[in-house]
Amino acid sequence: MDMKKLMLVLGLCLTLTAAAQENPLATISHDPGWCTLIHRWGFIGDSLCSGEHEYTRADGTKVWHDVYEYSWGQRIVAAVGGAVGYNFSQGGETAKGWIRNFWDYPMNRNADINAQSYPCQAYIMALGCNDKHHIKVGDARKDINLEDYTKNADTFAGYYGGIIQRVRTLQPKAPFFVVTMPNLYGDKEFSAQIRAMADIFENVYVIDLEKYGPDYDTPEFRARYFLDGHLNAAGYQLTAWMFMTYINWHIERNLPAFARIGLLK
């Protein structure tokens, strides 16, 4: 091999290595890493945030249960150790519905938990799977009124941003980790609006499952990690590992932003 070809090969190898290093989920760790800095977590979402299990009875009828103790959020809390986490989530939830069911008039399947009563040090937000069937996606840069969230537009982007704004009235410095939807559940336009939150608000970080997550629709993945149409216990545990890996990646690159995390009450 002449020197020119050798340099081309080395250059390609370096490019591929750099690309792999920029993939936060290139290697999924079971270790919570820097997630241990956060001792009080809030989990905002729908069925996939609630550990929902789906199965079919012998008579063919479907059953859905929010099994919170198996949710990825509670698996993160267990891995961190000495932490607490609150599931502000339920099956079928949307961004618009969340504001009603967990903020304005708390009536939900998690014992009517009120998100205003449990301010947290950090939040993971995973909504959108149900929204895409019920509301226009909107444009976060136009639909979010940074001065008055009650004037946000009647769109997914408006309500999603409104959740961050409402929670920030309790915890102005709390970091948010917003999750794009895996390809099986997602919609590119909705995921684009979720990513936009990191450009609009400070201290918001994207967990980009649409871009870096596994393919949820392969026969092997579904056999291992699904129970009918939702994840099984192993699937929620895998999700917890992915989220911890991704959050650790973000914190490692932004440690100064987390310098005062221990002072958030």
Pin down the residues of each PLM region.
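Alpha-helical scaffolding within the catalytic cores
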Residues: 27, 69-73, 98-116, 158-166, ...
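Oxyanion-hole/transition-state-stabilizing segment in secreted/luminal serine hydrolases
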Residues: 95-154
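Serine-esterase "nucleophile elbow" of acetyl-processing enzymes
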Residues: 21-89
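Hydrophobic h-region of N-terminal signal peptides that target proteins for export
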Residues: 7, 11-19
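Catalytic His-Asp segment of secreted/periplasmic serine-dependent ester chemistry enzymes
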Residues: 181-265
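Positively charged n-region of N-terminal signal peptides that target proteins for export
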Residues: 1-6
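Active-site segments of SGNH/GDSL-like serine hydrolases
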Residues: 129-130, 160-194
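Structural recognition of the beta-strand scaffold that forms the well-ordered cores
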Residues: 40-45, 49, 84-89, 121-127, ...
